[in-house]
């Protein structure tokens, strides 16, 4: 696959998602890092986003609840280059009805080369990185090149 460069701005577009058993952890993490997060643009699935917004006062653009299509909405934003970082506290010990959506979301984050945190430690590493508050170039698939090759 041919690659091209996409520049992430200093203010990142961050998606926040948590499965039910992980919402408390993501909420506590959001409170702990509120001063950092307020410098960025936050997106979240419905329940998670409303909890974070109500408990922290942070501005959050809320999608639908995960099982109702919110994971897919976030995935679409990733594919469009509109999400720079995915913080996704998922529960590896419990299956959810929308497991295929979860797998698709993680696949898209990998395809489009965005940083992904799936637990407290990895989320802390991401926000403590000097790159978190800088403009950063990343390599992403060159979709136009891909499409042109498919249409020949």
From Swiss-Prot:
GO terms for molecular function: methylglyoxal synthase activity. GO terms for cellular component: cytosol. Pfam families: MGS. Disulfide bonds: none annotated. Substrate binds at residues 19, 23, 45-48, 65-66, 98. This is Methylglyoxal synthase. InterPro entries: Methylgl_synth, Methylglyoxal_synth_AS, MGS-like_dom, MGS-like_dom_sf. Catalyzes the formation of methylglyoxal from dihydroxyacetone phosphate. HAMAP family: Methylglyoxal_synth. The lineage of its organism: Bacteria, Pseudomonadati, Pseudomonadota, Gammaproteobacteria, Enterobacterales. The gene is mgsA. GO terms for biological process: methylglyoxal biosynthetic process. Belongs to the methylglyoxal synthase family. It comes from Photorhabdus laumondii subsp. laumondii (strain DSM 15139 / CIP 105565 / TT01). The keyword Signal does not apply.
């Amino acid at each position: 696959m041919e690659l091209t460069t996409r520049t992430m701005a200093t203010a990142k577009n961050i998606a926040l998602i948590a499965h039910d058993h992980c919402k408390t952890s993501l909420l506590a993490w959001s409170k702990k890092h509120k001063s950092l997060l307020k410098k960025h643009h936050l997106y979240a699935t419905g329940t998670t986003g409303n909890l974070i917004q109500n408990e922290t006062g942070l501005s959050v653009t809320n999608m639908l609840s995960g099982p109702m299509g919110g994971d897919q909405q976030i995935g679409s934003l990733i594919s469009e280059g509109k999400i720079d970082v995915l913080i996704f506290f998922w529960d590896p010990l419990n299956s959810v009805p929308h497991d295929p959506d979860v797998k698709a979301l993680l696949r898209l984050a990998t395809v489009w080369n965005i940083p992904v945190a799936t637990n407290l430690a990895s989320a802390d590493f991401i926000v403590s990185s000097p790159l978190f508050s800088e403009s950063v170039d990343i390599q992403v698939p060159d979709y136009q090149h891909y499409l042109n090759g498919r249409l020949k």
